[in-house]
Structure formats: structure tokens, C-alpha cells
Swiss-Prot record:
<dbReference type="Pfam" id="PF04188">
    <property type="entry name" value="Mannosyl_trans2"/>
</dbReference>
<keyword id="KW-0812">Transmembrane</keyword>
<dbReference type="GO" id="GO:0004376">
    <property type="term" value="F:glycolipid mannosyltransferase activity"/>
</dbReference>
<comment type="function">
    <text>Alpha-1,6-mannosyltransferase that catalyzes the transfer of the second mannose, via an alpha-1,6 bond, from a dolichol-phosphate-mannose (Dol-P-Man) to the alpha-D-Man-(1-&gt;4)-alpha-D-GlcN-(1-&gt;6)-(1-radyl,2-acyl-sn-glycero-3-phospho)-2-acyl-inositol (also termed H2) intermediate to generate an alpha-D-Man-(1-&gt;6)-alpha-D-Man-(1-&gt;4)-alpha-D-GlcN-(1-&gt;6)-(1-radyl,2-acyl-sn-glycero-3-phospho)-2-acyl-inositol (also termed H3) and participates in the seventh step of the glycosylphosphatidylinositol-anchor biosynthesis.</text>
</comment>
<comment type="similarity">
    <text>Belongs to the PIGV family.</text>
</comment>
<feature type="transmembrane region" description="Helical">
    <location>
        <begin position="235"/>
        <end position="255"/>
    </location>
</feature>
<dbReference type="GO" id="GO:0000009">
    <property type="term" value="F:alpha-1,6-mannosyltransferase activity"/>
</dbReference>
<feature type="topological domain" description="Cytoplasmic">
    <location>
        <begin position="214"/>
        <end position="234"/>
    </location>
</feature>
<keyword id="KW-0337">GPI-anchor biosynthesis</keyword>
<feature type="topological domain" description="Cytoplasmic">
    <location>
        <begin position="158"/>
        <end position="161"/>
    </location>
</feature>
<feature type="transmembrane region" description="Helical">
    <location>
        <begin position="328"/>
        <end position="348"/>
    </location>
</feature>
<keyword id="KW-0256">Endoplasmic reticulum</keyword>
<feature type="topological domain" description="Cytoplasmic">
    <location>
        <begin position="1"/>
        <end position="13"/>
    </location>
</feature>
<keyword id="KW-0472">Membrane</keyword>
<dbReference type="InterPro" id="IPR007315">
    <property type="entry name" value="PIG-V/Gpi18"/>
</dbReference>
<feature type="transmembrane region" description="Helical">
    <location>
        <begin position="379"/>
        <end position="399"/>
    </location>
</feature>
<feature type="topological domain" description="Cytoplasmic">
    <location>
        <begin position="99"/>
        <end position="113"/>
    </location>
</feature>
Length: 493
């Protein structure tokens, strides 16, 4: 059973501790700091609220700000406004499942309170499982238990922390993505395809994950070229690639089609409560009962592309304005981290990168012992994935979302810092000399759990190397600052 694994047990314990501290701090910050009056989506509350609802709002209201309001609104009312379709249905559906489990309390709690409780509890669960999934993935890819352990612990202190706790889809997406990657590394291709498809139903950038499947299948094809029937192998490759692309793209396509039926087909509109209609009038939100929007007449009517362009001004270099310099500075640490990771890997394995990870050496007859850890040949496809996300995010998106965008999508953001810590922190080697401590008295005889080396470094902060201070300083600063600002409607999105 996986909980009996010592390192995974410590990862799970640390994840639980970090989640509890996160929830406590967001409640504290939300209580003592007045909310900033931001120009954000803020729909009216239709149901009356009692004392218990006010208590839930006071304890968990910090999790409902910025984009979280969209997810909560969609879970409660469905996709009423055109711009709601920027948010994929996977997470709202998960919240609805959570509220069904709270149905016995509906006489005491409003639907919104049930949704807030679902946000806190489900993201708590998703985060813990994602940390364990990242640890397991690291063991499979890095072949270095220490780096896998460090990376999973760093994930618990992620700079994207507040978005992994609040009513955002990042925690669920990270769980599905890391789990899908792990299944693919185990050779369970179609389980991986299914998990990647679910991830695409949670966030649109799940579509990029098709690259993992294509690379894995191409590796299998080239390794079988010496077989007697290469044409048959080529046909199998093409069929497998088609099925992978089709399966991963299906959730996205179905979601776009659903939007088309709501806004572009006559008679598909459903009744909307009058206060929400008035909100649409006041704010200029488009609802299905009005004139057909322009995207309905496109050759390929994609509401998602239209919304990103018209509502959020997302596009190539559109965000490159002088007034956005603070947001570029906010995104700079994660951009530097991923760019540094990419450069380190490419300069270490130039031939591997030139051959797209399909050939490790110019001379196939002399196979050197492969590197372990972050520099392992298996990491190539993950580095490419991270670099593509960074390039797209940096050129086409609101750059301030890069931290949560990368922090929930790529293990490179945690593997590379773990590599730097192991490579450049002498204190870790001294900590390894006493790496175990006994479990509680009720544990099996001889069972031990590893010390938490990240906490050990924090305890010995003054003697840590500069690289360690930079890494942990960045992680902890964003971990805490994100809670402080985001939970009070201050600009941390």
C-alpha cells in the first residue's frame, strides 16, 4: 500500500500541514485586512444567508475571489454569460459532486456555502494526491529518490500555492496531469490518454499534453523499425496518434459545441433569474437571448478563441505594454527558473535534443551510463513541454498567470530546483548522514520515515548556500504573499 512508503508518507504529511496552514492564514488575512474594491466579476447573491452561511463565508471567503467567482457561479447557475465559457467545466462539475455529498446540510447551509466547503475540501484532497503523484512520477523519470523527494516537498511550498487552494482548477489539473504522466511512464498508455483527456476538460492547456503521447508512440515506433514489417508498424503509429489526438481534443470540442448550441441555435436559451439579467445589462455581459455573437458565423465557431481575444485581450504580444512592467516583474522568477532549466538541459544533452530525445548518442554502439536526476534522458520531453508552455505564456498570455500556469502543469518547475539543491547545497549532504527518524510507537517495528530536508534547510537558513536561499526565498515569498494579496482582492491573479 502506498501510504506505507516512507518518503511518500512524509510528502503526504507535509502536504497536509501546508494545506492546514494555508486555510488558517487565508481566513486570518481575510478577516483582518479589508477587501480591495476590484473591478472583478461579482454576481449578486440570490439566496438569503443565515448565521452559519456568514460563518462559512468568514472562514472560507478568501478562497472565492477573482476567477474563483466564475467557477462558483458556473457551479451554481451554469454557463449563463458568454465570458463564462473561458472556464472549462471539469472543476465546476467536481464542485457539484462535492455539494451532493453535503446535501444533508442543505437545510442549514445555502448552495454557495456548500460550494465553498467543496472548494476547500476538494482542493485539499486534490493537492495532497497531486503531491504524491509528483513524487511517484519523479521516482519513475528521475531514478533519483532524493530529487523526487525534494521536488514533491517543494510542490507543497509552491509559489502557486493560493491558486492550488482557492476556487481555481489548478489543483485538479495538477493531479490529473501528474497522474497521466506517471501512467504513461508505467506503460499504461490508454489510462494515460484518459487522464490527459480529463485534464483537458479542466483546463485548455491540457491539449499541449498530446506531445507526451506522440513522443512516447514515436519512441516505440523507432525502436521497432528493425522488425520485419515496418509498414504495419507505421500504420499502427498513425492510428495510435490519431486516437490520442482525437481523445484529448474531444472534451475541448464538446465544450465548444455546447457553447454553439447555447448562443447560435434558436430556442436554446434557458430562463435566467432577473437579478442576473440586470447584471448582464449593467455590465454589458452577453447572454444567450440576445443577438447571435460574431463567432457564430466563423468557419470554425470557437467561442474560446473569441473570448480570449475580446474579453481578455489575449494574443501574440498584446500584453507587451509599458503599464504591464510590474506584471512582467511578477512573472520573472518562474520564467527565469524554467528558462534556466531548459538551457541547462539543452547544453548538457545537445545531441539528445537535436534528435528529439530519440537517440542518446551519436554512436549507438557506445551507450554511456545515463545521467540520473534532472539530467536523465527521460526528462527531455518534460523540458520541451515546459519550454513550450513558457514560450506560449510569455508571448501570448497575461504574463502574471505564468506562476500558476507553470506551477500546475509541469514538474520541471519542481525537479530543476530539487536538482539545484542536491547539486549545490552542501548542507543537504550533512543532513543525509542522519536521514531517518522513528515513526510513532504504533508503527510496525523498524519502520522509519525520512526527515524533511526542506524544513532542515529552513532551520539552518543562515548557513545555506546562496542558491538555496534564492530558491526557498522565492517559493516561500510567493507562497505567503499570494495568500495575503489574493484573499483580499488585491492584484495577485
Amino acid at each position: 500500500m502506498w501510504p506505507q512508503d516512507p518518503s511518500r508518507k512524509e510528502v503526504l504529511r507535509f502536504a497536509v500541514s501546508c494545506r492546514i496552514l494555508t486555510l488558517m492564514l487565508q481566513a486570518l488575512f481575510n478577516a483582518i485586512i479589508p477587501d480591495h474594491h476590484a473591478e472583478a466579476f461579482s454576481p449578486p447573491r440570490l439566496a438569503p444567508s443565515g448565521f452559519v452561511d456568514q460563518l462559512v463565508e468568514g472562514l472560507l471567503g478568501g478562497l472565492s475571489h477573482w476567477d474563483a467567482e466564475h467557477f462558483l457561479f458556473i457551479a451554481e447557475h451554469g454557463y449563463l454569460y458568454e465570458h463564462n465559457f473561458a472556464f472549462f467545466p471539469g472543476f465546476p462539475l467536481a464542485l457539484l459532486v462535492g455539494t451532493e455529498l453535503l446535501r444533508p446540510l442543505r437545510g442549514l447551509l445555502s448552495l454557495r456555502s456548500c460550494l465553498l466547503i467543496s472548494v476547500a475540501s476538494l482542493n485539499f484532497l486534490f493537492f495532497m494526491l497531486a503531491a504524491v503523484a509528483l513524487h511517484d512520477l519523479g521516482c519513475l523519470v528521475l531514478h533519483c529518490p532524493h530529487q523526487s523527494f525534494y521536488a514533491a516537498l517543494l510542490f507543497c511550498l509552491s509559489p502557486a500555492n493560493v491558486f492550488l487552494a482557492a476556487g481555481y482548477s489548478e489543483a485538479l489539473f495538477a493531479l490529473l496531469t501528474f497522474s497521466a504522466m506517471g501512467q504513461l511512464e508505467r506503460g499504461r498508455v490508454w489510462t494515460s490518454v484518459l487522464l490527459f483527456a480529463f485534464a483537458t476538460g479542466v483546463r485548455s492547456n491540457g491539449l499541449v499534453s498530446v506531445g507526451f503521447l506522440m513522443h512516447s508512440q514515436c519512441q516505440g515506433f523507432f525502436s521497432s523499425l528493425t522488425m520485419l514489417n515496418p509498414l504495419r508498424q507505421l500504420f499502427k503509429l498513425m492510428a495510435s496518434l490519431f486516437l490520442s489526438v482525437f481523445t484529448l481534443g474531444l472534451p475541448f470540442a464538446l465544450f465548444q459545441y455546447y457553447a454553439y448550441t447555447q448562443f447560435c441555435l434558436p430556442g436554446s436559451a434557458r430562463p435566467i433569474p432577473e437579478p442576473l439579467v440586470q447584471l448582464a445589462v449593467d455590465k454589458g455581459y452577453r447572454i444567450a437571448e440576445g443577438n447571435e455573437p460574431p463567432w457564430c458565423f466563423w468557419d470554425v465557431p470557437l467561442i474560446y478563441s473569441y473570448i480570449q481575444d475580446v474579453y481578455w485581450n489575449v494574443g501574440f504580444l498584446k500584453y507587451y505594454e509599458l503599464k504591464q512592467v510590474p506584471n512582467f516583474l511578477l512573472a520573472a522568477p518562474v520564467a527565469i527558473l524554467v528558462a534556466w532549466a531548459t538551457w541547462t538541459y539543452v547544453t548538457t544533452h545537445p545531441w539528445l535534443c537535436l534528435t528529439l530525445g530519440l537517440q542518446r548518442s551519436k554512436n549507438n554502439k557506445t551507450l554511456e551510463k545515463p545521467d540520473l536526476g534532472f539530467l536523465s534522458p527521460q526528462v527531455f520531453v518534460y523540458v520541451v513541454h515546459a519550454a513550450v508552455l513558457l514560450l506560449f505564456g510569455g508571448l501570448c498570455m497575461h504574463v502574471q498567470v505564468l506562476t500558476r500556469f507553470l506551477g500546475s502543469s509541469t514538474p520541471i518547475m519542481y525537479w530543476f530546483p530539487a536538482h539545484l539543491l542536491q547539486d549545490q547545497e552542501p548542507l543537504l549532504r550533512s543532513l543525509k548522514t542522519v536521514p531517518w527518524k522513528p515513526l510513532a510507537e504504533d508503527s510496525p517495528p523498524g519502520q522509519k520515515v525520512p526527515r524533511n530536508p526542506i524544513m532542515g534547510l529552513l532551520y539552518h537558513w543562515k548557513t545555506c548556500s546562496p542558491v538555496t536561499r534564492y530558491i526557498l526565498g522565492y517559493f516561500l515569498t510567493y507562497w505567503l504573499l499570494g495568500l495575503l494579496l489574493h484573499c483580499n482582492f488585491l492584484p495577485w491573479t
